[in-house]
Amino acid sequence: MRHLPYFCRGQVVRGFGRGSKQLGIPTANFPEQVVDNLPADISTGIYYGWASVGSGDVHKMVVSIGWNPYYKNTKKSMETHIMHTFKEDFYGEILNVAIVGYLRPEKNFDSLESLISAIQGDIEEAKKRLELPEHLKIKEDNFFQVSKSKIMNGH
């Protein structure tokens, strides 16, 4: 995973509607072209890093990249959970993401409860790791200062 940190941005699109409704863990979804342009050596799995919506504040996040085996998805997706409570949905806004580390491979779960428990564990682990000085400095990266009108993959 020599591509980490990896920076990308794209417009938030509607996903399957499962994050908030079934899991109680809202996610922002990237369009297919952002997922399709991920470097080949960023394998599927759960990652952590920083995210902002538009030119808003930068928050901790976890992101799932892959097919979500529990739901048997047929299309690869990139679903970001930002550790912040937003007042309203932000479909159509630009999501800026800096992936800084890898937590675990994606895997199937035998129940919705075990999936939720794993995600909650991922969130807690990401919160800890993002306090490391080498990860905190990425929160201040110029990537997050770019105007809303610039949409690009990479840095």
Curated annotation (Swiss-Prot):
Xref: SMART domains: Flavokinase
Cofactor(s) of this protein: Zn(2+); Mg(2+)
Catalysed reaction, written as an equation: riboflavin + ATP = FMN + ADP + H(+)
Record flagged with keyword ATP-binding: yes
Compartments (UniProt record): Cytoplasm
Cellular component annotations (GO), alphabetically ordered: cytoplasm; cytosol; mitochondrion
Pfam families in alphabetical order: Flavokinase (PF01687)
Presence of keyword Zinc: yes
Enzyme class name: transferase
Binding-site residues, Mg(2+): T27, N29
Name of protein: Riboflavin kinase
Organism name: Homo sapiens
